[in-house]
Amino acid sequence: MKWNFMMSHGHQQGRMAITLAALGVVYGDLGTSPLYALKESFAGHLGLQPTPEGILSIVSLFFWTIMIVVSFKYVLLVLRADDKGEGGILTLASLASRRLPAKPRALLMLLGLVGVGLFIGDAVITPAISVLSAVEGLQVITPELAPFVLPITLTVLVILFGAQHYGTAGIGRLFGPIMLLWFGVLAALGAYEIVQNPAILQAVNPLYALDFMVSRPGIAFITLGAVVLCVTGTEALYADMGHFGRGAIQLAWGSLVMPALLLNYFGQGALLLRNPAAIENPFYLLAPSWLAFPLLILATLATVIASQAVISGTYSVVRQAILLGYLPRQEIRHTSEHEIGQIYLPLVNWLLLGGIIIVIIWFQSSSNLAAAYGIAVTGTMALTTLLLMVVAARRWKWSRWLIALICAPLLLVDVTFFAANTTKFLAGGWLPILFALLAIIVMTTWKRGRELVLDKLEHKSLALKGFVDNMQAHPPLQVPGTAVFLSKSVQVVPHAMLHNLKHNKILHERVIFLTVQIKDEPWLSFKERIELTHLGEGFWQVVAHFGYKEVPSMEEIFQACAQEDLKVTMAKTSFFLSHENLVSTDLPGMARWREGLFVWMNRNSLKATDFFHIPANRVVELGVLLEL
């Protein structure tokens, strides 16, 4: 009995630790929305005044938006659509398109790519608006500090991005406790004000929201573009599911995050009922004056943590796109010996910081930035619902009636929010769309370019089986040792092999043709790692399989080979690779400008030797000229 109690107690402690960690990563963005969401719903250009009716209507919209979008759609439905525990829009697209014919599969993966592009557009806006809205609390403390808001915001973000290469393994342990304190403060400030003015609780009645939508449809439609700010960051619940698990994310939401957010929004509404002038900054004005500065510090820490979650999420999404073949190889550094998900991509880091600095200098304030916020978020939400409908039909075997009953209303909500945000396009909504469009162009160009290169390489090469038969019938001069030839195709001879024979006229006594393939599953077991084929005396073919969440490793490949009695020692093996020198031409395939972009990306991509961590002194690289 005592042992069972101890086991149960240990399990409870472990679950609480994971839930606390999830607070620091998953809910950072969503948890900092109270800094600006309600304030922006009454922004002057929307035409809505903080009258009692207006306040009750907006708070009612906030309540039901959170309940429908977060609690029902994401927490109860979307989190069920996992792929071996992993989530995220690319994962959802992969799950929806699995075992489909080529054309529908390509369409669903394109939806996933659009979602990735929108996520990247959102990733530029989120750190900017979050930290800026927190530091703007200085103006509440004293207006004289207003000129320091932008410099302090930029300094905080430069320090944050500059420290990324150290990783978050150490300081990350503080994220959970800080966010726990943050949500506790949100709840306490809101609850105190609700007690002072409990009339705000009437906003739970959906009739306030519905009456507002029906009686003032024009203003209500435009206002929805600001209301959606209360659910920005919701996609992180799904994207980070692989790190913390569905249970911890659901537990954190139901037990702490949802109550704290609702209490704070209702508290801000109660404050506005009592003092409409507090619309200037209802979040900070919830607190007594003596608490303003400590609250500013805590809010800044919370927004830094929210920004870190977005940065880490961007690294993860970009790595996934690289492995799936939608982006060129680039340097991926692991910042933790224990957590495979903690990575650092230098190029992504500095591009993201550059975009954020430009955005902050351009828009100057969180209110101006709010106009740019929303389109990317709602677009991603709508795409998630579309892909979820496919998963519900194909994987969960839902009937059309059930999908129409549950998913269609959710899609209507998403599309309505997206349409409302398009009204902000000229005021700044174009910015995340521009970033998303650039990301989509880059990803589709790289994917198409690699397909063209592979077609041309296969066309210019020889069939592998015929080549091996010919080498055995007419063997060239053999030298001792093992040679590994990296190949993009399992059907043809690698060009590095053909060039080696042409120029050196020798063949190693043991030749391994190695092809690395990324599967549309997040993780593969060790038993699924390789397919080993003995092609004939001295010739082997190894096809190594990795999931799109894994990092291809030569060491692991050769460990799997050893299990199949093919022992390879890295230090005694020569690796032969072909390097394509690409030339843009007028041949059919891609537009000339896309060919130019692809050639530039190919030239600046990380070499296979560096990506696969092959010792440089064991590599022979042979060039091949290809016309696109």
Swiss-Prot record:
Q: Which InterPro entries match?
A: K+_transporter (IPR003855), K_trans_C (IPR053952), K_trans_N (IPR053951), Kup (IPR023051)
The record ties this protein, via Pfam families, to:
K_trans (PF02705), K_trans_C (PF22776)
Q: How does it sit in the membrane?
A: Multi-pass membrane protein
The UniProt keywords, alphabetically, are: Cell inner membrane, Cell membrane, Ion transport, Membrane, Potassium, Potassium transport, Symport, Transmembrane, Transmembrane helix, Transport
Q: Which reaction does it catalyse?
A: K(+)(in) + H(+)(in) = K(+)(out) + H(+)(out)
Keyword Ion transport set for record: yes
The GO molecular function terms of this record are: potassium ion transmembrane transporter activity; symporter activity
Q: Cellular component terms, GO, for this chain's entry?
A: plasma membrane
Localization, per the record, is: Cell inner membrane
Q: What residue ranges are annotated as transmembrane? A: 18-38, 58-78, 106-126, 141-161, 175-195, 219-239, 253-273, 285-305, 343-363, 371-391, 401-421, 425-445
Give yes or no: UniProt keyword Calcium.
no
Give the highest taxon in the source lineage: Bacteria
- Family from the record: Belongs to the HAK/KUP transporter (TC 2.A.72) family.
Reported function: Transport of potassium into the cell. Likely operates as a K(+):H(+) symporter.
**UniProt xrefs under HAMAP family:** Kup
What is the name listed in the Swiss-Prot or TrEMBL entry for this protein? Probable potassium transport system protein Kup 1
Organism from which the protein derives: Aeromonas hydrophila subsp. hydrophila (strain ATCC 7966 / DSM 30187 / BCRC 13018 / CCUG 14551 / JCM 1027 / KCTC 2358 / NCIMB 9240 / NCTC 8049)
The organism's taxonomy opens as: Bacteria, Pseudomonadati, Pseudomonadota, Gammaproteobacteria, Aeromonadales
Gene, per the UniProt record? kup1
